[in-house]
């Protein structure tokens, strides 16, 4: 029988489905709800030492719907990191670990360009019992104005330095969360892994403008008549996320074997998860999907992933992790392969043609005649 249980960076997860950082992990109550529903791990909403600087606005979401069915497939947010005090988070980390000692609790953390601040937040979170860290180097809105989030993640030199600060003191596994708002995601990936990070999480949201209201002529989501570009997620980003995960997995395999990848971007079903794992992910994160469909989607997701494994006779996630990466190549190689395949097919067809009268066979007379004909 196949199993979804897996061990990632020494963390034992009952399944690879992880609550991604955001509203679904915004306090102890909802984190507990996620564990009760059966999620493999939970990443809290990003925390910082100075939550008093975080001020959210309303509304802060805008959604894109199918013209035909009305289903939500695109989601923009201009939400910031947690506005709850760091002391409150430390208290709730302890409460969660006391109530769910086997639950894998991952702290998403973000700070300004300050070595002491990064050392402090890591040390205090570890004392509170968190099992791992995800470094939010990738939020595309609001925080970059303070040189945080994507402002760090877009600069490989700064990223490597800050990840290095964290690795100086961290005693738990560390994942660096990548911004997709770069030309080559391999560059920040290498920077994070050179600094010693245990894994990569990708992707965070894509900087975007969801649309403009044609009645008010104001862009969405509108706050007092104005807005700011936000982060785009949901089903629509999955093709971009898959491409970037494939690129990251290729870097890991070739240059940093043993490091891990947590795939993020539009995942709502077990089949979605299977695609990310086939392209090299060890775990998959779901955030917008939970906001759209609820915490209980983890059950059908597990069932669907197990059904996929049974169909292909895979017993463990490791049996198919990264399997499909091998089928990516260059366009020049595609042309070469197609040219060779057509030549081979033409040669095979030529073999079936009669070259001399002695080769005519009464049993295959019609087929032999057709082989010699055009049209």
Region spans (language model):
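A glycine-rich phosphate-binding loop feature that marks nucleotide/adenosyl-phosphate handling sites
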Residues: 263-264, 319-327
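Short secondary-structure boundary segments
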Residues: 45-47, 137, 204, 288-289
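N-terminal capping/small domains of soluble enzymes
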Residues: 1-106, 110-115, 119-120, 301, ...
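Short catalytic-loop micro-motif centered on adjacent basic/acidic residues
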Residues: 17-20, 105-108, 174-178, 262-263, ...
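Structured C-terminal cap/extension of enzyme domains
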Residues: 275-286, 291, 296-299
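C-terminal helical cap(s) of enzyme catalytic domains, especially alpha/beta-barrels
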Residues: 51-68, 209-229, 291-314
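Alpha/beta enzyme core
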Residues: 32-37, 41, 98-99, 112-262, ...
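Helical hairpin unit composed of two closely spaced alpha helices linked by a short loop
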Residues: 252, 261-264, 285-287, 293
